[in-house]
Swiss-Prot record:
Cleavable signal peptide: none
Residues that, per the record, bind ATP: 171-178, 232-241
GO MF terms, alphabetically ordered: ATP binding; ATP hydrolysis activity; sequence-specific DNA binding
Disulphide linkage map: none
Tagged with keyword Transcription regulation: yes
Pfam families (alphabetical): HTH_8, Response_reg, Sigma54_activat
Domain Response regulatory positions: 5-121
Cited function: Member of the two-component regulatory system RT0550/RT0603.
SUPFAM superfamilies named in the record: CheY-like, Homeodomain-like, P-loop containing nucleoside triphosphate hydrolases
Name used for this protein in its record: Putative response regulator NtrX-like
Positions of the Sigma-54 factor interaction domain: 143-369
Domain of life: Bacteria
Positions carrying 4-aspartylphosphate: 54
Amino acid sequence: MSQLDVLILDDEESIRNLIAANLKDEGFNPKVAANSTQALKIISEKPVSAVILDIWLQGSEIDGLGVLEIIKKRYPLIPVIIISGHGTIETAVNAIKMGAYDYIEKPFNNDKLIILLKRACEVTKLKRENIDLKSKVIDKTELVGGCSVTLKYKMEIEKAASSSSRIMIHGKVGSGKELAARLIHKQSKRVNNPFIIFSPTCMTTEKINQELFGESEKQENNNKRPTILEFANNGTLYIDEVSNIPIPIQVKLLKFLKDQTITKPCGKKTKVDIKIITSTSKNIQDEVNNGKFLEDLYYRLNVFSLKVPSLYERKEDIPLLVKYFVKQLSKFSGLKERHFSDEAITALQSYEWPGNIRQLRNVVEWTLIMNPLTTGNNEIIKPYMIPSEILANSANLTKLEDSFDMLSMPLREAREVFERQYLSAQMSRFNNNISKTSSFVGMERSALHRKLKLLSLHIPPTNKINEEEYEKANA
């Protein structure tokens, strides 16, 4: 067995030394601490495999149950074995409820402690393997897609991850800002340390103040509970929709950013090392101009600016995203894995997706739920199975609403109506990219330019690459 680090926290030196000697004989690597401050410092520097914790800890700033609470919140997989010579059944029950692996009384049998410790480490090992297995089955930090916009975005994320600067992620609701933050953390040097998400949107000013800085109107809550900033020490703190933080808290956050020091109400100062990532779906510059966001705070947080592309800009990724969501839902929601027809994919690509990736996932899930697999006849998802609002707002490619009117038209006029609908839909599908549209429909670019002009289809450019082609098409 490879050596496992085990922390022994007890206020009695003789007990610490005795347990440490016994653990060393059994192949463990013991680390000792006399109080909560020493113990939490040891764990923050390098998480241990297990903790043996005395419940009383005389002379310690935080008692055993308080230390247990902190460990289980910061490092939920570390097993904690409680030991005490003055315990009661009520204390033991409370410790187990708070997440302790087990509870034994002093004086204890050394063999029993060793067996308990080995069992706790083995259980934790199995939990970690299970988590690793689940993460391999489906990676929650996977950025699906291979279009040019997505590839460029992936490169920007890599640059952000290698930077030590603070990062602000800009993107529309549902575009995947949290995913971007997770990817940055995953690819950074802090990957093995905490990734903490803080969302202040639905919190009161008092609650935000308490969570970030440990300040509460209830004096008994002050100083005891570790803050979000302490939880994120040595790791990454992701603040979602940072523009929703009230001005008084912005002032405190700005002060914290200057030296990354937390000052508790009691006056105690704690230095932390955190990579801070923030996100917003609002135009922060407008918020600054309107006096809703501190300009200095904006500049300190927006050192590295990352823009998340909307799904509208990534329409070519929709087929891959649909496959990904179908596979995800079949594995974790029990829904049967299905195939979306080319016509259904085309309908999805023709929609503008104001709700972005999140909306697409919801649509895929709704479609699978509302069209259960009953026979082989409905194994393939057809356009009519997709939510009606998606089809109603998609470009008119999968159906011809004017089919009855066209029956009364001469062939030349009917063909013009069809071509206008068809090319309009295809241009929308490929985000107004002339090259990709011409390739798909089987026309030369110059021929497509002429056809668009002939049909009076003036498609505005969506990026600089298309500007020259747009001018040619509308010349």
